[in-house]
Structures are given as structure tokens and as C-alpha cells.
Amino acid sequence: MNIREWPVEERPREKLLNRGAGSLSDAELLAVFLGSGVKGRNVLELARGLLVKFGGLRQVLEADRQAFLGELGLGPVRYSQLQALLEIGRRNLAMSIERESVMDNPLAVRRYLKAMLRHEASEVFGCLFLDTKHRPLAFEILFRGTIDRASIYPREVVRRALLHNAAALILCHNHPSGNCEPSQDDVHLTLMLKRSLALIDVRVVDHVIVGDGEPLSMIEHGWLAG
């Protein structure tokens, strides 16, 4: 059935306007973004099919370009719109933390780091550089690939910290497997970087690991001692 034939209050766009975005299901939210269906499938049927095919809303949002464009009803225009939407979200998160100390809102900082890393298909390692009041100066992804002591160069982390005139920083990396539990290499790497950065009076505030669910703070679990 064409959505125009539905009761007005049940159409996704009208439902959003009348009840708020929080009242919509994942399929309805995706349908609002898509805007229209394809031949033989209305937009809500298309949205439901995509959620099943990709495995959920997060997987649709994080799909790579080739996989996204390979689906019926999706094309370069919708892909570019989606990427713009995701970047707007990341920048909004960045603005929410840029004028305050990371100590004042650690949850917002972890959510920002998750937004920056969760879409990465392979392991990446980054730093959020902080000023003397622990306010963000810059975020950079420094290394890609398997994250261990052999692939991370302390001198590069030190160099970037000096370049940004950072007084402190938060280390971060992702676990594409979804499991946020740190490995022994993660712990040893963190302590090695902590010692290297201490030589230039730069403090490691935390090391955040991004996976499924809430990011893990190594400082909160006692893994930064030493």
C-alpha cells in the first residue's frame, strides 16, 4: 500500500512532526531519511528491508560506499546525504565538549570519541589533545592497522603533542570486534606512551577503547596506574 493511503497520523514524517523523533522506530526514522520508496516497495518497506539486510540501523549508517550503493533504492545522492548527516552529528558532539574541561563531562568526551571511531572497519589509534585546562585542542587519528607496541611510534605521538602545544591528551582506539576489554598489548602500550609523554610534561588523562555499547575508560578501571 502506498504510504499516502495510510492514516495521516501513522505516516513516518507526520508522526515525527506530531509526536517527535523519539516516537519513531528505526525503520520509520530511516524511511524519513530515504524520503521515497522504489517500484513495488513503499519507503517503509524499503527501510525495513535495508535494516534486515545490513543487520540494523547502526550497520546501515556505517556501511561502506560500495555496499550502500549496491542496494536497490540507494544511490550516490543518498550516500552523500547520509555522510553529511553523520558529519553534522560528529561536529555537534565536538562543539559540545570544545569549551569545557574533559573532566567536567567525561561521558560526552567518550561519546565524541566513539562517534569519531565507530565507523572504522579496521583498528585505528587517535589522540584528543588538550590544553592546560583540559579543554580540547584537536583530534587526530595517528595510526591505522593492528594496534600494538610494534605499530605505534611514541615519538610520533610526542611530536604531535608538541605541535599542538598540548598539556595533556586522551588516547583512544577502536576494537572492530566490538569487545572493549583491553588486551595486554593495550595496557603495555598505554603505560609506554604515558612514560614517553611524561618526559615532555604531557599528561595522559585516559585511554578510551571504542567497541559495541559504551566506550571503556582505562583510567576508571585502574589500568593507567604505573
UniProtKB/Swiss-Prot annotation:
Transmembrane segments: none
Keyword set, alphabetical order: Hydrolase, Metal-binding, Metalloprotease, Protease, Zinc
Family: Belongs to the UPF0758 family.
Gene Ontology molecular functions: metal ion binding; metallopeptidase activity
Record-level GO BP terms: proteolysis
PROSITE patterns (UniProt xref): MPN, UPF0758
UniProt-recorded name of the protein: UPF0758 protein PSEEN5431
Record InterPro entries: MPN, RadC_JAB, RuvA_2-like, UPF0758, UPF0758_CS, UPF0758_N
Record Pfam families: RadC, UPF0758_N
Binding positions for Zn(2+) per the UniProt entry: H173, H175, D186
CDD domains: MPN_DUF2466
Organismal lineage: Bacteria, Pseudomonadati, Pseudomonadota, Gammaproteobacteria, Pseudomonadales
